[in-house]
Amino acid sequence: DAQESRGLGDVYKRQPLPYELDALAPHISKETLEFHYGKHHQTYVTNLNNLIPGTEFENLSLEDIVKKSSGGIFNNAAQIWNHTFYWNSLAPKAGGAPTGKLADAINAKWGSFDAFKEAFNKSAAGNFGSGWTWLVKKADGSVDIVNTSNAATPLTTADKPLLTCDVWEHAYYIDYRNARPKYLENFWALVNWEFAAKNFA
């Protein structure tokens, strides 16, 4: 579950990573995770905890804050949610191709898994500036690729997120400098299709 935990009368905490910091190497290095998870993700958590005391949001779940807030509270809450979802979208020694009903839905939409990957890469490479590229399940049960900018997330729409790729520069700059397409190429070796399939079910 991508929900952040809260202590008793306490603040939001970062979800622990579902793997060790070096588990995604060589595709995503330990150093990237030290900065991305250890610093960027943590900063959003710290910011949110500074912003919500005394507001209508202080006792809400993270998902509810994302759905009901705007401005700085939304930006930080959504970035926490998006990052936790991204960490769960990845796994060591993962990749490969989806199976079952999710594979059927992907094939129904794009004709083949390779055609889907090409469409996803093109969408993610063309996602201007900072943002996220998502595989989502539409209300009618079909799947689609959606780009969001900055902290925006499908959580505030009728789409159900299945997996995401973080295309903020901090997700890949240490390992790939400005070569986002190279990062995307390596992303597929880490995709956690089990997580995506659970979200699709």
Residue ranges of model-derived segments:
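Single conserved hydrophobic/aromatic residue that forms the stacking wall/gate
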Residues: D1-Y12
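Feature for soluble, non-membrane regions of globular proteins
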Residues: D10-A201
